[in-house]
Amino acid sequence: MSDFTPTPYILDTGVLADVARGDADLIGLLQDFDRAGQPLIIPALAATGALLDGRGSPDAQALLAGLAAFEHAIVAPLDGVTQSAKLTDTMAVTGLDVYDAHAAAIADVSICPILTLHAEKWRQPSRALDNPPHIIEITDPDQ
């Protein structure tokens, strides 16, 4: 048995919003990652943005809670004034909203890639960070 742990993927608001909408293909892909031992980071504020986007959907919260219950999923909270200051700086330099800025701030300090459905939205903001994150775009969860 190997002690290797893959580098975690940070899920952006778009990925979480599609999970909250019940995208079965995307949920299946994330389940496959979890079964393979791939850690998935769920930024708490990105989850907030996903729930705001899916407001009115009776299953949105349950779907995100299900994702958070995966064996290799970790919900990353915003913890304290120091992290709040880092988030504020990230928002200021990238122009991202608070939801995706939370994902970017985590990526900037952890050197973990961001998993997204829309890589283009990350191109410019990534350049503004001290440690530009690697962006992984899901182009077709069926493949």
What are these regions (language model features)?
Residues G49-A50, K86, Q124-P125:
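Phosphate- and divalent-cation-binding pockets in alpha/beta enzyme and binding domains
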Residues S2-F4, D108-Q143:
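Acidic, PIN/NYN-like endoribonuclease modules and their adjacent C-terminal/linker elements
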Residues V15-L16, A46, H102-A103, E120-W122:
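Alpha-helix capping/helix-boundary segments
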